[in-house]
A protein has these predicted regions:
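Bacterial N-terminal signal peptides that target proteins for export
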Residues: 1-9
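Bacterial Sec signal peptide processing site at the extreme N-terminus
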Residues: 20-38
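Structured C-terminal helix/loop/strand segments within mature extracytoplasmic catalytic/sensor domains
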Residues: 58, 291-415
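Active-site-adjacent helix/loop patches that line small-molecule binding or acyl-intermediate pockets
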Residues: 67-85, 89-91, 144-272
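A short, well-structured edge-of-sheet supersecondary motif
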Residues: 87-123, 344-345
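Active-site SXXK
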Residues: 118, 131-154, 285, 353
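Active-site-proximal alpha-helical segments within enzyme catalytic domains
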Residues: 138-144, 248, 276-295, 347-358
């Protein structure tokens, strides 16, 4: 089913999740949730498929309730180990160029895994809310790819990594002055840096009778599987201090990348970054991309499998800004970070991980989140580039196991 309006999205979410939705807490200075054991929520009965889980208790509203994960569950054990290993890590510091982000308790720390079958594993501050910031960018560009096409995203915005910081004006100037293949070079960079994300908002088609903000928020809600809202404190704080982004959007207008009202595009982008989410939300949103664009909790086909694949390709290229190559080299999965402390990592066809920990490294990525995801995926085998040698083909076409020790050719080469 393809969703066409925000109102349809909200109706779907209410019907699917019912009144049994969990309560959600907003992260604030000095607040936080005490460390908790891993809990698991089974997928909705009608979406469970072939996932083998003990029967889940269900709330009166129809939403499966969390329960302790069964002993020996490999995902639960890996999640608990990753959480404990980095719980006391004190590296990094909160973003301070957006004043309100500097006040968030740096000890908040949550990890969540959501499988494509809809099982949810969570530990720590998994439901504390924070501003989504740049983690919103892949989901908006997924909607643009779905409605305007992948080609226009490549042409108007670009899909290559910039090698510069996420808000770099230098990167815009360098891209604008590349002498060759000008039809393919755009100063916006890609949809996951600020210039490209603002251009993405400008490019987003709006169905008749809807406003653009309704499309943006409704799309994020469809990915998350629940109603979301803007944190007004964050929105005001960003709006009062976003002078750098104002310069960026004026350049985008001068370069004819932004074709509408530049200040409107910037305001919509700022609102988008100010939406409140939790690590659990990010994991559900990532699992929707991992599941070919189908939300594993609501069953809604939010975007097509093709749009989800294109989106993940962009995330793999530029999700962690100038450190994306290093991340892909070490971890091997697409991931997107935000200066609010969130990270979403996606293993296509399997699961997604959502994390929340406010202290950041110099590139703007959560320090604890990166370390925890890397440790978790090492145990769960999520690296997309990892493989084992295949056996030799027999004349029948069957594969025989690879022999122990070096092959004869390798052995000869050692002599």
């Amino acid at each position: 089913m393809k969703v066409t309006s925000r109102h349809a999205l909200v109706g779907l979410i209410v019907i699917s999740l019912g009144s049994g939705c969990a309560t959600w807490r907003r992260a604030r200075a000095g607040g936080g949730t005490a460390a908790s054991p891993v809990s698991i929520t089974a997928p909705p009965p009608d979406l469970a498929g072939n996932l083998v889980l003990a029967a889940a208790t269900v709330t009166p509203g129809g939403a499966p309730a969390p329960r302790p994960a069964p002993a020996g569950d490999p995902i639960a054990e890996a999640l608990a180990d990753a959480y404990r290993s980095f719980k006391d890590l004190s590296e990094g510091k909160n973003a301070d160029y957006i004043p309100i982000l500097a006040s968030i308790d740096p000890k908040l720390y949550g990890l969540v895994v959501v499988t494509v079958q809809g099982a949810i594993y969570e530990i720590g501050s998994a439901r504390d809310e924070f501003s989504i910031q740049s983690v919103s960018k892949p989901f908006t560009v997924a909607r643009v790819i779905e409605t305007a096409g992948a080609e226009i995203v490549d042409k108007r915005i670009g899909v290559n990594a910039t090698g510069q910081k996420f808000n770099s004006i230098l990167a815009m100037d360098l891209l604008k002055n590349i002498p060759s293949d000008k039809d393919k070079v755009t100063p916006a960079g890609n949809p996951l840096v600020n210039p490209g994300a603002i251009a993405t908002v400008d490019l987003l088609p709006v169905p008749t009778g809807m406003d653009k903000w309704g499309v943006i928020l409704g799309n994020l809600e469809a990915f998350a599987g629940r109603k979301l809202s803007v944190n007004d404190e964050v929105y005001r704080s960003e709006s009062e201090t976003n002078t750098h982004n104002r310069a960026i959007v004026q350049l985008l207008k001068d370069y004819e990348v932004v074709q509408g009202d530049p200040m409107q595009a910037l305001d919509l982008y700022t609102r988008q970054c100010s939406v409140s989410v939790s690590a659990r939300d990010l994991a559900v949103m990532g699992a929707t991309l991992a599941n070919g664009g189908r939300n594993p909790l609501t069953g809604a086909q939010v975007v097509s499998p093709e749009s989800a694949a294109k989106t993940l390709a962009i995330v793999a290229t530029a999700g962690l800004y100038e450190t994306t190559g290093e991340w892909l080299y070490k971890v091997g999965v697409p991931a997107k970070s935000g200066v609010g402390g969130g990270i979403v990592a996606v293993v296509p066809g399997k699961f997604a991980v959502g994390t929340f920990s406010p202290p950041l490294d110099a590139a703007g990525n959560s320090v604890r989140g990166q370390r925890a995801v890397e440790a978790l995926l090492q145990k769960l085998g999520g690296n997309l580039f990892a493989s084992k040698p295949a056996g030799r083909a027999r004349s029948t076409g069957a594969m025989s196991p690879a022999p122990d020790g070096p092959s004869p050719a390798v052995a000869r080469g050692r002599n």
